[in-house]
C-alpha cells in the first residue's frame, strides 16, 4: 500500500461523465470523511472542478478507491473504469504537482487550478482527513507550483483572449492604475477581462451593456460603474482603453463616434480591443490617427506565439516536478527507515532488559558473579545474532548471492 491518486479529467471523459463523478461543495466534507475511512491512514483529499475529479489517498489500494468512487456516485465499473487514470507512490506525487502547476490543464499553465487545489486541501483539513504525510505532500506541492512559476515562463505569456487583451494594454500603457477603462458587454469574457484589469491595478472601470441589471451585477464585484449602450458616447471621451465583447450583429462603436471622442480628448491616444465576432467596432476606426484598434485575430496570433513559449516552459517545469516528487519520496523513505531503526532498537533493548533482569535476580540469590556475567554475555550474543544468522543461512542455501552480499555488508563482515 502507498500513496494513490485516481481521477477523471477533460482528456479522458466527456462532460456527461465528469458531471456524474463531480462532488457538490456542500457534500465534499462528508465525502472526504467517507473516503478516508477506507484507508489505513485515514488520509484522503478530493479535488473536484469542472474539468477534473481526483482522489488522493495514503495507505490505500487503488482498487478500493475506485470501488468507493463508483459506489458513492452509483455508477457501474464499466462506465467509469475506461476513463480512469491511476498513479501510485512517486508518480502520484508528481501528478499532483503537475496538476497544481497547470501542466495538466485544458489551458496549459493556467493559474486558477492552484487555488482550487488549495481550497480542496483546506476542506480536507477541516474534515480531519489530512495527517502528517499528506499535509507534507500538499504543502510541498504548493511550494513546487510557486517554484515552477518563478523559475519558468509557464504563466508569463497570455493564452486566453481576455488575458491577451489586458496584456496588450499593459504593453502600451506604462501603468494601468491611472487609466480609465470602458468595457462593452457583460458576458463571461468581459467579466474575465475585468478581473485581470483589477488584478493589474485598474481602479476606474465603466461597464456598458444592453441590459443594465447585468452590468450592475458585474460592477458590484469590481467596483465599476454601469451604463447602457446608449450612454457610451458620453463616456467614450474619458476612456484610455476600450475593450468590447458583445453578441451584437452590428458594430456598436462606429468611426464617427470614436473620431468625435478623440477630438474631445485633444487627440490623446486610445486603445481599442475588439474581441467580438462579429465585430463590435467598425474596422475603419483603425484609420484614425490616435486610435489603436486590435481585433480577435490580432490577439489570436499573439496567443499562438505564447502557447509555443509556454510549451517550452512546460518542458522545464516537468523536470522540476520530477525532481521534487523524487525528493518527497526520499523523505517518505527516510521516515520508513526511522521506524525500522526505532523498532530494531526497541527489540534489542527488550532482549537486553530481560537478560539483565535475570542476571540481577541470580546475583541476588547468591550466584557466582563471574559465571552470571559470562552467561549474560553468551545469551545476549546468541539472542542478537540469531536473526542475522538465520538470514545468512537462508541466503546461502538458496544461492542468493545478492542478499548474501548485502547481509555481509550490513553486518560489517567485509571490512578490512
From Swiss-Prot:
GO terms (BP aspect): protoporphyrinogen IX biosynthetic process from glutamate
Name the positions where NADP(+) binds: 185-190
E.C. number(s) listed in UniProt: 1.2.1.70
Question: What keywords would UniProt list here?
Answer: NADP, Oxidoreductase, Porphyrin biosynthesis
- Pathway membership, UniProt: Porphyrin-containing compound metabolism; protoporphyrin-IX biosynthesis; 5-aminolevulinate from L-glutamyl-tRNA(Glu): step 1/2
The reaction(s) this protein catalyses: (S)-4-amino-5-oxopentanoate + tRNA(Glu) + NADP(+) = L-glutamyl-tRNA(Glu) + NADPH + H(+)
Q: Which Pfam families match?
A: GlutR_dimer (PF00745), GlutR_N (PF05201), Shikimate_DH (PF01488)
Amino-acid positions noted as binding substrate in the UniProt annotation, renumbered to this chain: 49-52, 105, 110-112, 116
Tell me the active site. Answer: 50
Gene Ontology MF annotations? glutamyl-tRNA reductase activity; NADP binding
Q: Does the keyword NADP apply?
A: yes
Quote the SUPFAM superfamilies the UniProt record gives: Glutamyl tRNA-reductase catalytic, N-terminal domain, Glutamyl tRNA-reductase dimerization domain, NAD(P)-binding Rossmann-fold domains
> Of which family is this protein a member?
Belongs to the glutamyl-tRNA reductase family.
Record HAMAP family: Glu_tRNA_reductase
Any other noteworthy remark? During catalysis, the active site Cys acts as a nucleophile attacking the alpha-carbonyl group of tRNA-bound glutamate with the formation of a thioester intermediate between enzyme and glutamate, and the concomitant release of tRNA(Glu). The thioester intermediate is finally reduced by direct hydride transfer from NADPH, to form the product GSA.
Q: How does it assemble?
A: Homodimer.
Description of its domains:
Possesses an unusual extended V-shaped dimeric structure with each monomer consisting of three distinct domains arranged along a curved 'spinal' alpha-helix. The N-terminal catalytic domain specifically recognizes the glutamate moiety of the substrate. The second domain is the NADPH-binding domain, and the third C-terminal domain is responsible for dimerization.
- Known role: Catalyzes the NADPH-dependent reduction of glutamyl-tRNA(Glu) to glutamate 1-semialdehyde (GSA).
Name of the protein in its database record: Glutamyl-tRNA reductase
From what organism does this protein derive?
Shewanella halifaxensis (strain HAW-EB4)
Amino acid at each position: 500500500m502507498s500513496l494513490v491518486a485516481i481521477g477523471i479529467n477533460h482528456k479522458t471523459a466527456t462532460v456527461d461523465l465528469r458531471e456524474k463523478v463531480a462532488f457538490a461543495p456542500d457534500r465534499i466534507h462528508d465525502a472526504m470523511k467517507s473516503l478516508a475511512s477506507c484507508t489505513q491512514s485515514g488520509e484522503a483529499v478530493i479535488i473536484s472542478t469542472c474539468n477534473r475529479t481526483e482522489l488522493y489517498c495514503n495507505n490505500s489500494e487503488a482498487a478500493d478507491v475506485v470501488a468507493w468512487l463508483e459506489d458513492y456516485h452509483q455508477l457501474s465499473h464499466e462506465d467509469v473504469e475506461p476513463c480512469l487514470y491511476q498513479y501510485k507512490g512517486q508518480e502520484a506525487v508528481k501528478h499532483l504537482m503537475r496538476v497544481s502547476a497547470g501542466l495538466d490543464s485544458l489551458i496549459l499553465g493556467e493559474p486558477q487550478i492552484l487555488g482550487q487545489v488549495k481550497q480542496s486541501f483546506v476542506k480536507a483539513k477541516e474534515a480531519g482527513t489530512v495527517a502528517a504525510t499528506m499535509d507534507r505532500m500538499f504543502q510541498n506541492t504548493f511550494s513546487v507550483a510557486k517554484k515552477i512559476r518563478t523559475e519558468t515562463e509557464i504563466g508569463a505569456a497570455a493564452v486566453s483572449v481576455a488575458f491577451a487583451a489586458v496584456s496588450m494594454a499593459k504593453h502600451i500603457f506604462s501603468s494601468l492604475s491611472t487609466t480609465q477603462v470602458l468595457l462593452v458587454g457583460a458576458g463571461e469574457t468581459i467579466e474575465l477581462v475585468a478581473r485581470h484589469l483589477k488584478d493589474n491595478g485598474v481602479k476606474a472601470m465603466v461597464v456598458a451593456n444592453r441590459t443594465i441589471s447585468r452590468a450592475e451585477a458585474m460592477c458590484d464585484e469590481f467596483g465599476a460603474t454601469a451604463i447602457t449602450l446608449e450612454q457610451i458616447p458620453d463616456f467614450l471621451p474619458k476612456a484610455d482603453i476600450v475593450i468590447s465583447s458583445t453578441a451584437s450583429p452590428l458594430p456598436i462603436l462606429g468611426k464617427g463616434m470614436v473620431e468625435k471622442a478623440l477630438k474631445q480628448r485633444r487627440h490623446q491616444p486610445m486603445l481599442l480591443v475588439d474581441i467580438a465576432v462579429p465585430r463590435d467596432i467598425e474596422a475603419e476606426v483603425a484609420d484614425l490617427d490616435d486610435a489603436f484598434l486590435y481585433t480577435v485575430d490580432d490577439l489570436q496570433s499573439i496567443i499562438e506565439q505564447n502557447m509555443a513559449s509556454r510549451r517550452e516552459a512546460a518542458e522545464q517545469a516537468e523536470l522540476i516536478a520530477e525532481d521534487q516528487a523524487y525528493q518527497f519520496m526520499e523523505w517518505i523513505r527516510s521516515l520508513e527507515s526511522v521506524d525500522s531503526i526505532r523498532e530494531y532498537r526497541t527489540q534489542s533493548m527488550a532482549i537486553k532488559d530481560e537478560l539483565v533482569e535475570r542476571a540481577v535476580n541470580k546475583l541476588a540469590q547468591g550466584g557466582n558473579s563471574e559465571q552470571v556475567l559470562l552467561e549474560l554475555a553468551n545469551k545476549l550474543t546468541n539472542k542478537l545474532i540469531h536473526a542475522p544468522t538465520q538470514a545468512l543461512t537462508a541466503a546461502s542455501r538458496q544461492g542468493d548471492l545478492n542478499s548474501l552480499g548485502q547481509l555481509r555488508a550490513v553486518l560489517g563482515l567485509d571490512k578490512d
